[in-house]
């Protein structure tokens, strides 16, 4: 006896976590930050520098904060990935990987001399030890005069 075949059942992929991007970030109360990051990526795509009068640091230094789960790391990953997709150099820095800080400091002079944008992301700024705080200070001083190095930092508290 032939039984009618059951339709093929597809697995529900509930374990898949999408890659962080600016397009899949739920901005909520962070709409201004999200919009600024989208505009910045658009300027990289069009290869048009931001207007110097937009703000003193030409939107090259941005720090955001919020509690665990607020999207800080998502946005840092998204901006870094967006830069890499456009062929720009990205240097992700975290408290857990001090060697990445050393590698960046070795390249910082060359980056600062270039007109090609590059991106530095620093996650968990509040967890940096004294050595990494000193490294961040050196990096910030080095890139201050640069026109193309962007640094995005995030932590759990407002700067104080």
Give the positions of each predicted feature.
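Short, glycine/polar-rich helix-capping loops at beta-to-alpha or helix-loop-helix junctions
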Residues: 160
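Short glycine-rich substrate-engagement loop in P-loop NTPases that contacts/grips substrate
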Residues: 75-76, 80-117, 128-130
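Short loop/turn elements that form and flank the Walker-type P-loop nucleotide-binding site
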Residues: 57-58, 86, 113-116, 145-148
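Conserved P-loop NTPase "ATPase switch" module shared by AAA+ and STAND
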Residues: 93-95, 110-135, 139, 150-157
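A short, basic N-terminal segment
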Residues: 1-51
């Amino acid at each position: 006896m032939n039984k009618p075949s059951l339709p093929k059942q597809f697995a529900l992929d509930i374990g898949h976590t999408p890659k962080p991007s600016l397009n899949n970030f739920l901005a909520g109360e962070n709409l201004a930050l999200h919009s600024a990051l989208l505009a910045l990526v658009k300027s990289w795509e069009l290869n048009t520098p931001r207007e110097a009068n937009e703000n003193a640091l030409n939107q090259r230094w941005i720090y955001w904060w919020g509690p665990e789960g607020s999207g800080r790391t998502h946005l840092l990953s998204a901006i870094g990935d967006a830069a890499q997709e456009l062929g720009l150099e990205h240097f992700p820095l975290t408290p857990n990987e001090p060697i990445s800080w050393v590698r960046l400091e070795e390249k910082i002079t060359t980056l600062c001399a270039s007109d090609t944008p590059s991106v530095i992301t620093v996650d968990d700024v509040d967890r940096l030890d004294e050595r990494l705080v000193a490294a961040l200070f050196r990096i910030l001083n080095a890139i201050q005069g640069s026109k193309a190095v962007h640094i995005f930092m995030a932590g759990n508290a407002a700067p104080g």
